[in-house]
From Swiss-Prot:
Species in which this protein is naturally found: Mus musculus (Mouse)
Annotated ranges, domain IQ: 785-814
Biological process annotations from GO: muscle contraction; response to muscle activity
One MF term in the entry's GO annotations: calmodulin binding
Residue numbers bearing the Phosphothreonine modification: 64, 69, 391, 419, 776, 1241, 1255, 1265, 1286, 1467, 1501, 1517, 1730, 1736
Record-linked PANTHER family: MYOSIN HEAVY CHAIN, NON-MUSCLE, MYOSIN-4
Phosphoprotein listed as a keyword: yes
Keywords of the record: Actin-binding, ATP-binding, Calmodulin-binding, Coiled coil, Cytoplasm, Methylation, Motor protein, Muscle protein, Myosin, Nucleotide-binding, Phosphoprotein, Thick filament
Gene (name only): Myh4
Residue ranges, annotated region (Disordered): 1128-1147, 1153-1172, 1276-1299
Annotated residues for binding of ATP: 179-186
Name of the featured protein: Myosin-4
Residue positions where Phosphotyrosine is found in the record: 389, 424, 1464, 1492
């Protein structure tokens, strides 16, 4: 506590800041009983002081100060603090902390007019309602540089602490001044600005005045003057406050690197423009109106055409017109002066006053209704003329635009009539808009004036927001203000209670989390979250028919009863109507919603706006131009692009945007809180209402803040910082010369200091202190430093005195010597012999001439020798001098290059600032776009509700349809039962008819099942289609962001090229300067060379000196003259020498710089100094010798004088060059300092921008997620509605079709019954004929042998086809079952995946938000650590001894940064995983879409097949009638055909053996592939994330293969159905075989297509293999991600197992397809035999077989590729190895069979060599086997030719039917081709989309990498600039010390 003497510096403010010593002593000596002195609860006063009299049974009886005796419970009694704590400055120091103690401490301090009190970490101030002398200049000076504990509580102390934190922590600061309206926020804001403007004034006022040009005041004056101007136009009187800020402002004061004031800017929020046209009774409008009418400046009254009576103007006279505490006349002069100081031009100043006057005139405009019309018309034009005059408009045009505005309808404009009320509303809207835009324009102009373009490093922001206030009539503006205060209170709570405790947990300190119950999230979410009040308001604004009532109904429907903070208002008598109530932190507020929709939309008369834009008043035209609109919406002074294009932005949306930006700014700074309190409602000085103050304390969290300050550790410091700063307290605790960890060093240091060791804790990276301990350590450090400095001063003074004493002794000895000689001379002066000596001595001069000549000759020889030696030394020194000069030039070049680099860096900094501004604009656009989407979402949500109502109605219709459908189903089942009974009756008929009937029934059931499946799949596909559109929209957004990034990169590239060009120009100019300098150096060398020549000439002349000795006497007089000239020359030489010494000092400075870099040239400098001294001595000797010999060189005097003059001129030139270089040097130093500070500012701004970008990106992603969810719901409802409509029509149509089908089946049943009876009768007749012809058959057996064999062969083929058909039917059923189960399963999995994705996205968003907050704190830590590292590097250069320890500390810091950076990368990886999961869902969407389209095609195919079957039934009925005639003949040859069947069976087995042989080959290849796979699998395990995409691509290929196989199955089914028609007749079977051959060719073509797709798959696989090499480089990063991706890998493995099952099914289907291909090959051999018989061209058959063989080989290659593809997708190697082992065993069993087949293949190879040896060599085992079969079949076919001739007639009859069948097959083939085309198209689209996504992702990563590199380069440049700055300062210091 300071003494009275120490408090004297505060002047007259001392009594208002701290108690006097006398009061403190009295308080300590005051009697006090701790047990009896208490506070008790009181109904009126809340708490009163009392004395305990007794305690009984939980009750306490006490006597109050008023003399009353009360009895209360124990929990209503609170202990009183001792008297020494009365009026304590920091309430956290109280012994007993509770509400009454805090209340009475504030009350007692307030009674003593001590309005500022510390409350833990923040400050509380109470409004005194009177002027106190606590803000005088001496108070500002007293608080400057003082620590918090050294001075009394004050707003200046808070400001100075923020200023010091900014300089030491290198972090932006903010001061949040909060409180209710009237608590004194605005006054404290002004005092903060006053303090900064006083202590941090700019350094060079002259320079500022020179650069400011038209600026009429200094920057400090302008910052201070901004407040009066803004208060005049933005402050007004309210019920609770005479000077209430009706807008919010965030003032940022920027400082340079040295803490000097650099610039400032102001952001404003939500001006209450409704006050312009409406005020309550106890309030008034903005001050400016009443200031103008105060008549202080009569010229304004005249210019504005107004009066001095406010009641003459309706807009400003609805409430009070005067305020006792405000002098409007003085305020007008202050406002007018502020306008001048802030640099507004005269025209702008006049425009401001004119627009203000126009607003007042607008309120007096009158309108009336036309007779018999609702149209309004002007009621007089005088007022309109005045308003038009002030705004430079035509009054007639203005009135016309108001009464008859033009409205755009479509593409045309029409004139609209207005009622009187509409005109008044339009005038009011225009007045409010004009005033608001003018206010925002003024803020913009102020910011332009305050932006001095000086380098700025950090800023301190001061927040002054309109306070929480409860009016009788609360509107939308009041809701916004209260919501802002709610958010700020939540920010305070989160910072004070949540972040503080999270810091303890993170640092590992034992701490139990305390929930203070201060979370305001419920109220905030009620207002701002989706479907909150703002959301509903904006949604209603989009509906043209929305009203206030509909808005209120939606609010009640959405929130009443669901949220405790939303209540119905309780009507009160005498108060305005209210529609809903909100429970805020500071009280419950009733809100009236009348006019909210119009206020939020803020409509303007566009016709009048058009007039404004053309106004002759330039300021008005600018206000309503497009550019100003953008600026106005930017929140005052912040430049930004145009907001939302053609759409509009509501007031609430703009307010939320500005508020979010404010909260982002605050989160990026270190906040300091100042809590302003209202003492009473009556504005009475000194009075305090207890309940009011307690309510504010509770709401503001004051008590909780004190508690956490007392319990927690509010002070914390990094271990390295603590070690560096406090090591001086006990240096012996930390051993020197050995490394010790900073944490251990801190622990040892604290353990060795005499302090309370319970007052601190050690965290992981910091040491934490209780409140006050750090101040104690600071005091101890100051004392220790004082001791050390005292000792140092004593040692220095002793040394200096010893040096002085030594000099005194030397002078004493010299004086003694002189005195002795003088005394001796005085003794002999009168001696006669001495007198004679004096007389004779001059006469002996001539006699002694010869001696003198001899002496002179000797002297001459000595001088000559000395001259030679000196000349040699001079040359040597000149060479060294040249070398040093060269070194100096090199160093100067280096300095110049560094200066150029710094200039380049400055230009880059400027460009980065511009880029930052552009990025901020883009961020604004993105935010606005996101808000647009939110608005659209809100609109769509409303539509969703309507659709839900419609859906409920449609559901009722669906229920009715379902009932009808159930009836139809019953009828259908009954019909199916009848058909089943008929089928059972027909079971005894012929086998062929039974099979046909079963097939027909199966197809009907499949048809019905397919229809049902189709309906179910349509629903699923609709859902998936919506997901696809959502993903496509996301891809579009990514592409848009990518385009923006490309544009930004192009801009940066252009800026880079421009900077490089500027750099080249600067380098060229530098080179020119260097060339000039080198030329001057060369001239100097030339002159020095001439001097050496002169010296040599002098030597020559000295030889002539002997001859000229006779002339010495004559020249002695001349010598005296020359001596005078020589003296002058010596003076000039001395001057040149001084200049040379200056150059030497420059050289020494540069050498010192080198010494700082390397520390190796100090010895050289000392040697140079010695040599320089020797050189000076020699030169002096040389000059003396020269002067002696100049007596003999009179002839050369003139030349010598000329040369000296010339050298003098050169020296003057050099002096001028030196001065120029000195000037450039000083300028470069200044530029270096500026650049350093600028670089620091840019780096900080860049960090803030990155934080802002990340925050906005998170917000954007959250908004997009919400938007997509809403869009998906709406699309689902729309599609469901459309689907239900179509379903109802489809059901009706299907019902009609089923009825027709039932009737048709009934008719077919009757016809079949008749046909069966007829066939039975025919069968009996044929049986009789058979018995009669049995004998004839035996006699003709020999002739029919061949026919029997042929029949058996064909019968076998028929049986094979029947088996294949049955197998195909079973496969169809299997595929259908699988499709249904897979579809259902996939749908369920998709739904589950979607839920998981939504949950994970939500978790990811929460995690990202948490990580962002961590990143923000880490960014601050990183910046602080980086700056500290720079300081440490400076310490390293100063002290090499501590280098090792500091390097280790630097590495520790780097590790911490790397760990946090890794965490950041891991978080980013999680986000990427979420994106990839989204992409996997998109692939599932494509799969289901393909399946859906296939099912549609199957439905169409089945419909056509149904029609064809009906046609076939009729055809078969006719054929059966004919077939009955041939049954008898077929029975005859049955035995022959059975024999042929056995032969065909044998050949089939041989073909199967060959196929198994080929499969053995495939298995061997598979083993090899498994080996390769085992090698690749290791790499794949490390790259699950990248290969997952490839797996999806391959899965789509397999699915396309499956669709192709399905098409093949359908085509084979068609072929089988065609063949069944031919079963009754042998000729028909032959033609059917021919048809089957064509079908086989088509199947082969399908296989070719499949092979093509497999080739594409192989290409993708090759690309993947090549990409593996690239992926190796990413191995390290993937390993770090492996742990985080483990959960995703588990899920992917589940999907991989499903994929594996699908692959196995595909492989099985592939084997089945191979078997069916083999079967088709067998049929083809029969077809080829028939062709040979018909065409007799074996060579053509061989060619065709070669083609077939080639296709078979391609099929083989396809199998290989499919296996390779499957191997790439495989994850579980053991299953594959087991399969390989099993196949290996099969291979060994089949080796013997292969050997037998090899013999046959050799024979076939010899036969095939005739047709072409080269092709036969390429054929493999299966081809050889097929050729052997061809040869065997040829032999049998030659024998069967005879039988075929007998059947030629029947072939001709069946040709027509074959042609019909061929047409059917062609149609089916066309359908298959179309399906395959669709599959390929979908596949290509999917691949293109994936490729595009990958390309975008790669580009994004590349851009991110480049951004990181740019950041690193900026950091490096910043560190270099700081080093240069430090070096420059040290050099400057040394120069000063040397001078």
């Amino acid at each position: 506590m300071s003494s009275d003497a120490e408090m004297a510096v505060f002047g007259e403010a001392a009594p208002y800041l701290r108690k006097s010593e006398k009061e403190r002593i009295e308080a300590q000596n005051k009697p006090f009983d701790a047990k009896s002195s208490v506070f008790v609860v009181d109904a009126k006063e809340s708490y009163v002081k009392a004395t305990v009299q007794s305690r009984e049974g939980g009750k306490v009886t006490a006597k109050t100060e008023g003399g009353a005796t009360v009895t209360v419970k124990d929990d209503q009694v609170f202990s009183m603090n001792p008297p020494k704590y009365d009026k304590i400055e920091d309430m956290a120091m109280m012994t007993h902390l509770h509400e009454p103690a805090v209340l009475y401490n504030l009350k007692e301090r307030y009674a003593a007019w001590m309005i500022y009190t510390y409350s833990g970490l923040f400050c509380v101030t109470v409004n005194p309602y009177k002027w106190l002398p606590v803000y005088n200049p001496e108070v500002v000076a007293a608080y400057r540089g003082k620590k918090r504990q050294e001075a009394p509580p004050h707003i200046f102390s808070i400001s100075d602490n923020a200023y010091q934190f900014m300089l030491t922590d290198r972090e932006n600061q903010s001061i949040l001044i909060t409180g209710e309206s009237g608590a004194g926020k605005t006054v404290n804001t002004k005092r903060v600005i006053q303090y900064f403007a006083t202590i941090a004034v700019t350094g060079d006022k002259k320079k500022e005045e020179a650069t400011s040009g038209k600026m009429q005041g200094t920057l400090e004056d302008q910052i201070i003057s901004a407040n009066p101007l803004l208060e005049a136009f933005g402050n007004a009187k309210t019920v609770r406050n005479d000077n209430s800020s009706r807008f919010g402002k965030f003032i940022r004061i920027h400082f340079g690197a040295t803490g000097k004031l650099a610039s400032a800017d102001i952001e404003t929020y939500l001006l209450e423009k409704s006050r312009v046209t409406f005020q309550l009774k106890a309030e008034r409008s903005y001050h400016i109106f009443y200031q103008i009418m105060s008549n202080k400046k009569p010229e304004l009254i005249e210019m504005l055409l107004i009066t001095t009576n406010p009641y003459d103007f309706a807009y400003v006279s609805q409430g009070e017109i005067t305020v006792p505490s405000i002098d409007d006349q003085e305020e007008l002069m202050a406002t007018d002066t502020a306008v001048d100081i802030l640099g507004f031009s005269a025209d702008e100043k006049v425009a401001i006053y004119k627009l203000t006057g126009a607003v007042m005139h607008y309120g007096n405009m009158k309108f009336k209704q036309k007779q018999r019309e609702e149209q309004a018309e002007p009621d007089g034009t005088e007022v309109a003329d005045k308003a038009a005059y002030l705004t430079s408009l035509n009054s007639a045009d203005l009135l016309k635009a108001l009464c008859y505005p033009r409205v755009k309808v479509g593409n045309e404009y029409v004139t609209k009539g207005q009622t009187v009320q509409q005109v008044y509303n339009s005038v009011g809207a225009l007045a409010k808009s004009m005033y608001e835009k003018m206010f925002l324009w003024m803020v913009t102009r102020i910011n332009q004036q305050l932006d001095t373009k000086q380098p700025r490093q950090y800023f301190i922001g001061v927040l002054d927001i309109a306070g929480f206030e409860i009016f009788d009539f609360n509107t939308l503006e009041q809701l916004c203000i209260n919501f802002t205060n709610e958010k700020l209170q939540q920010f305070f709570n989160h910072h004070m209670f949540v972040l503080e405790q999270e810091e303890y947990k993170k640092e590992g300190i034992d701490w139990e989390f305390i929930d203070f119950g201060m979370d305001l999230a419920a109220c905030i979410e009620l207002i701002e979250k989706p479907m909150g009040i703002f959301s509903i308001l904006e949604e209603e604004c989009m509906f043209p028919k929305a009203t206030d009532t509909s808005f209120k109904n939606k609010l009640y429907e959405q929130h009443l009863g669901k949220s405790n903070n939303f209540q119905k208002p309780k009507p009160a008598k005498g108060k305005a109507e209210a529609h809903f109530s909100l429970v805020h932190y500071a009280g419950t507020v009733d809100y009236n919603i009348i006019g909210w929709l119009d206020k939020n939309k803020d409509p303007l008369n566009e016709t009048v706006v058009g007039l404004y834009q053309k106004s002759g008043l330039k300021t008005l035209a600018f206000l309503f131009s497009g550019g100003q609109a953008a600026e106005a919406e930017g929140g005052g002074g912040k430049k930004g692009g145009k907001k939302k294009g053609s759409s509009f932005q509501t007031v609430s949306a703009l307010f939320r945007e500005n508020l979010n930006k404010l909260m982002t700014n605050l989160k990026s700074t270190h906040p300091h809180f100042v809590r302003c309190l209202i003492p009473n409602e009556t504005k009475t000085p000194g009075a305090m209402e207890h309940e009011l103050v307690l309510h504010q304390l509770r709401c503001n969290g004051v008590l909780e803040g004190i508690r956490i300050c007392r319990k927690g550790f509010p002070s914390r410091i990094l271990y390295a910082d603590f070690k560096q700063r406090y090591k001086v307290l006990n240096a012996s605790a930390i051993p020197e010369g050995q490394f010790i960890d900073s944490k251990k060093a801190s622990e040892k240091l604290l353990g060795s200091i005499d302090i309370d060791h319970t007052q601190y804790k050690f965290g992981h990276t910091k040491v934490f202190f209780k409140a006050g301990l750090l101040g104690t350590l600071e005091e101890m450090r100051d004392e220790k430093l004082a001791q050390l400095i005292t000792r140092t001063q004593a040692v220095c003074r002793g040394y200096l005195m010893r040096v002085e004493f030594k000099k005194m002794m030397e002078r004493r000895e010299s004086i003694f010597c002189i005195q002795y000689n003088v005394r001796a001379f005085m003794n002999v002066k009168h001696w006669p012999w001495m007198k004679l000596y004096f007389k004779i001595k001059p006469l002996l001069k001539s006699a002694e001439t010869e001696k003198e000549m001899a002496n002179m000759k000797e002297d001459f020889e000595k001088a000559k020798e000395d001259l030679a030696k000196s000349e040699a030394k001079r040359k040597e020194l000149e060479e060294k001098m040249v070398a040093l000069m060269q070194e100096k030039n090199d160093l100067q070049l280096q300095v110049q290059a560094e200066a150029d680099g710094l200039a380049d860096a400055e230009e880059r900094c400027d460009q980065l600032i511009k880029t930052k501004i552009q990025l901020e604009a883009k961020i604004k656009e993105l935010t606005e776009r996101a808000e647009d989407e939110e608005e659209i979402n809100a609109e769509l949500t409303a539509k969703k509700r309507k659709l839900e109502d419609e859906c409920s109605e449609l559901k009722k219709d669906i229920d009715d349809l379902e009932l009808t459908l159930a009836k139809v189903e019953k009828e259908k089942h009954a019909t199916e039962n009848k058909v089943k009974n008929l089928t059972e009756e027909m079971a005894g008929l012929d086998e062929n008819i039974a099979k046909l009937t079963k097939e027909k029934k199966a197809l009907q059931e499949a048809h019905q099942q397919t229809l049902d499946d189709l309906q179910a799949e349509e629903d699923k596909v609709n859902t998936l289609t919506k997901a696809k559109t959502k993903l496509e929209q996301q891809v579009d957004d990514l592409e848009g962001s990518l385009e923006q990034e490309k544009k930004l990169r192009m801009d940066l590239e252009r800026a880079k090229r421009k900077l490089e060009g500027d750099l080249k120009l600067a380098q060229e100019s530098t080179m020119d300067i260097e060339n000039d300098k080198q030329q001057l150096d060369e001239k100097l060398k030339k002159k020095e060379f001439e001097m050496s020549n002169l010296q040599s000439k002098i030597e020559d002349e000295q030889a002539l000196g002997m001859q000229l000795q006779k002339k010495i006497k004559e020249l002695q007089a001349r010598i005296e003259e020359l001596e005078e000239e020589i003296e002058a020359e010596r003076a000039s030489r001395a001057k040149a020498e001084k200049q040379r010494s200056d150059l030497s000092r420059e050289l020494e400075e540069i050498s010192e710089r080198l010494e700082e870099a390397g520390g190796a040239t100090s010895a050289q400098i000392e040697m140079n100094k010695k040599r320089e001294a020797e050189f000076q001595k020699m030169r002096r000797d040389l000059e003396e010798a020269t002067l002696q010999h100049e007596a003999t060189a009179a002839a050369l005097r003139k030349k010598h004088a000329d040369s000296v003059a010339e050298l003098g001129e050169q020296i003057d030139n050099l002096q001028r060059v030196k001065q120029k270089l000195e000037k450039e040097k000083s300028e470069l130093k200044m530029e270096i300092d500026d650049l350093a500070s600028n670089m620091e500012t840019v780096s900080k701004a860049k960090g803030n921008l990155e934080k802002m970008c990340r925050t906005l990106e998170d917000q954007l992603s959250e908004v997009k997620t919400k938007e997509e969810e809403q869009q998906r719901l709406i699309n689902e409802l729309s599609t469901q509605k459309a689907r239900l409509h179509t379903e109802s029509g489809e059901f009706s149509r299907q019902l009609d079709e089923k009825d027709a089908m039932v009737s048709q089946l009934s008719r077919g049943k009757q016809a079949f019954t008749q046909q069966i009876e007829e066939l039975k009768r025919q069968l009996e007749e044929e049986s009789k004929a058979k018995n009669a012809l049995a004998h004839a058959l035996q006699s003709a057996r020999h002739d029919c042998d061949l026919l029997r064999e042929q029949y058996e062969e064909e019968q076998e083929a028929k049986a094979e086809l029947q088996r294949a058909m049955s197998k195909a039917n079973s496969e169809v059923a299997q595929w259908r079952t699988k499709y249904e189960t897979d579809a259902i399963q996939r749908t369920e999995e998709l739904e589950e995946a979607k839920k998981k994705l939504a949950q994970r996205l939500q978790d990811a968003e929460e995690h990202v938000e948490a990580v962002n907050s961590k990143c923000a704190s880490l960014e601050k830590t990183k910046q602080r650590l980086q700056n500290e590292v720079e300081d440490l590097m400076i310490d390293v250069e100063r002290s090499n001894a501590a280098c090792a320890a500091l390097d280790k500390k630097q590495r520790n810091f780097d590790k911490v940064l790397a760990e946090w950076k890794q965490k950041y990368e891991e978080t980013q990886a999680e986000l990427e995983a979420s994106q990839k999961e989204s992409r996997s869902l998109s692939t599932e969407l494509f799969k289901v879409k393909n399946a859906y389209e296939e099912s549609l095609d199957q439905l169409e195919t089945l419909k056509r097949e149904n029609k064809n079957l009906q046609q076939e039934i009729s055809d078969l009925t006719e054929q059966i009638a004919e077939g009955g005639k041939h049954i008898h003949e077929l029975e005859k040859i049955k035995k022959q055909i059975d024999q042929e069947k056995s032969e065909l069976q044998a050949s089939l087995e041989e073909a199967e053996a060959s196929l198994e042989h080929e499969e053995g080959k495939i298995l061997r290849i598979q083993l090899e592939l498994n080996q390769v796979k085992s090698e690749i699998d290791r790499k794949i395990a490390e790259k699950d994330e990248e290969i997952d995409q490839l797996k999806r691509n391959h899965l789509r290929v397999v699915e396309s293969m499956q669709s192709t196989l399905d098409a093949e199955i359908r085509s084979r089914n068609d072929a089988l159905r065609i063949k069944k028609k031919m079963e009754g007749d042998l000729n028909e079977m032959e033609i059917q075989l021919n048809h089957a051959n064509r079908q086989a060719a088509e199947a082969i073509r399908n296989l070719r297509n499949t092979q093509g797709m497999l080739k594409d798959t192989q290409l993708h696989l090759d690309d993947a293999l090549r990409g593996q090499d690239d992926l190796k480089e990413q191995l390290a990063m993937v390993e770090r991600r492996a742990n985080l991706m483990q959960a995703e890998i588990e899920e992917l493995r589940a999907s991989l197992e499903q994929t594996e099952r699908s692959r196995r099914v595909a492989e099985q289907e592939l084997l089945d397809a191979s078997e069916r291909v083999q079967l088709l090959h067998t049929q083809n051999t029969s077809l080829i035999n028939t062709k040979k018989k018909l065409e007799t061209d074996i060579s053509q058959i061989q060619g065709e077989m070669e083609d077939i063989v080639q296709e078979a080989r391609n099929a083989e290659e396809k199998a290989k590729k499919a296996i390779t593809d499957a191997a790439m997708m495989a994850e579980e190697l053991k299953k594959e190895q087991d399969t390989s082992a099993h196949l290996e065993r099969m291979k060994k069993n089949m080796e013997q069979t292969v050997k037998d087949l090899q013999h046959r293949l050799d024979e076939a190879e010899q036969l095939a060599l005739k047709g072409g040896k080269k092709q036969i060599q390429k054929l493999e085992a299966r081809v050889r086997e097929l050729e052997n079969e061809v040869e065997n079949e040829q032999k049998r076919n030659i024998e069967a030719v005879k039988g075929l001739r007998k059947h030629e007639r029947r072939v001709k009859e069946l040709t027509y039917q074959t042609e019909e069948d061929r047409k059917n097959v062609l149609r089916l083939q066309d359908l298959v081709d179309k399906l395959q085309t669709k599959v390929k198209a979908y596949k290509r689209q999917a691949e293109e989309a994936e490729e595009q996504s990958n390309v975008n992702l790669a580009k994004f990563r590349k851009i991110q990498h480049e951004l990181e590199e740019a950041e690193e380069r900026a950091d490096i440049a910043e560190s270099q600039v700081n080093k240069l700055r430090v070096k420059s300062r040290e050099v400057h210091t040394k120069v000063i010390s040397e001078e």
